[in-house]
């Protein structure tokens, strides 16, 4: 079918075609190799923005540190990190004046959270720097390793299960003269492979104990590992992101809880809400500015961009904010919240894997780890890398760079939003005391500023005042990248506003298509994505119908399940034809079994099994959904499952879809090749956790599952539960006397073993 693309736009207002200009089709770019160069860029840039600050030396680690706070006021438009403490505190005071009691209430809410949060909160999240192994690990493993090592050193407060008690352990660990850790090491040996009779290198992982002195431990506790941010669209250069360790994570969580609670009460904050709720918030601010500007005033909107938001923020400023926000609160609470910014003021950025070199004729390859960069001869490097290394050398300690100023990406999104909103708050007429006034929206580093004034000069004056106020708080509005329009047309966090929000449909494109989980989930996710886009993103009925047809086609090609009466030959077509011929009611066959598609845009909300149930042959029903059929997935499937869909920007978000357990909801097995790598020890740990958790769930089925109260360990809880259950079963005659005696004996044996250990 030939379509002339210009015809598509004849009836479309230009602003609705915005989505065709977004770089969202095709695969996003991924980074390869090491992030060392990007991390060095970040460290060097951050120091450059604050270069006129004061240098000091950290007494514990000996790391040189740059403090730009209350530094010189800017003389030009170059980005700088010289925030002024008194200005930040005053902005906070004005924010509180406009919202009486906001800080007080948020502190009370947070205090409650602090006392109730459990350690397992820290298992959420992806990669975490594991300080015991000096590399990244999944969050749950890193937490377990940390707690294991703490226990080895006599720090056991975290066994209560409360996060706040784990943080007490962290604080105490910093005072210890030495920490004993369990770390992994690799042994390589050459062995002859039985099958191929060739010599192969076999790696084994062993565990060994090692002692860290106070300085080494503190350096590790303050270290953020860095990786390259993947899949960023519309950018030529990659950039580095930070993965903090377990010591920092818990403290950051509480600070962000407080900041989130404040953001929820601020109408100018684009966080923590999202989607339609965020659009409603935005529309309210715009409406307010438009109605007030009626005939007498002009109203203009800046689509704002800040230069290097993270690299000019400063943890010391966040400490000042927290000190102010919590000023009437109990001492313990203030201490807990001030630790995160203090740790960030003393942070070390790990430079990642280092550089890979290969000789001209590609014969030799060698890895130069980051630890060696401080001493290696620089003639091997090209000019740009040489400059980077020279610049960063004075800051290096053990392969990590001292990085006191700057925040690293994604750490204090909520708190930095509070800082941004405090400037927007200063735009009220009673504060500006002039003819112009402003309001706007802030979401992390993204902002939209609406300025009202009687004439153009007033607008200009308002923008200038906003710009200068930002500078005083360490925020640098980019004059090159921000642009101004009559209010009614602007962009904020990729929402395009033109007298109402324009659907930016291209952003959703990556989530269309077959996810590749399994036949059952993929069908469900595919139709749910289409349904959601009809609700939220102006996907019209005709386009939705077409999307559905394309999806079904894609699905059939992916799983080779073309209709039973098709001519297409695939690996599965023989089986599918056989099933088709022996089925009486062909409409009842699932698409993945070669059946017809019964979906249209009216019934997308119904899972396919339910949609076709009445049409199925009874023996087909019996095979498809019979719990005794070994191929029906026996995972306890909730009625709602979560899939991860990739929107075009921001983190992968989870989307709910209906799940019906059938023979098609299989779960693929783990790839075995991991068993031969250095990760094997970790895998064994993970399997051990899995087994323990499964066992625990057998004793405490979810219906009766209350969090164990008191400080009993998992084993103690299970033993006492086993005794109670056995007694009940024995007294009601469900088990014989011999069985009861046997169970009691096993329980006693377990307790004896625990005592001996």
Swiss-Prot record:
Disulphide-bonded residues: none
4Fe-4S keyword on record: no
Annotated stretches, region: Promoter-binding site: 249-256
EC top class named in words: transferase
Key words, A-Z: Eukaryotic host gene expression shutoff by virus, Eukaryotic host transcription shutoff by virus, Host cytoplasm, Host gene expression shutoff by virus, Host nucleus, Host-virus interaction, Inhibition of host RNA polymerase II by virus, Nucleotide-binding, Nucleotidyltransferase, Phosphoprotein, RNA-directed RNA polymerase, Transferase, Viral RNA replication, Viral transcription
Assembly with partners or alone: Influenza RNA polymerase is composed of three subunits: PB1, PB2 and PA. Interacts (via N-terminus) with PA (via C-terminus). Interacts (via C-terminus) with PB2 (via N-terminus); this interaction is essential for transcription initiation. Interacts (via C-terminus) with human PKP2 (via N-terminus); the interaction competitively inhibits the interaction between the RNA polymerase subunits PB1 and PB2.
Protein's name in the database: RNA-directed RNA polymerase catalytic subunit
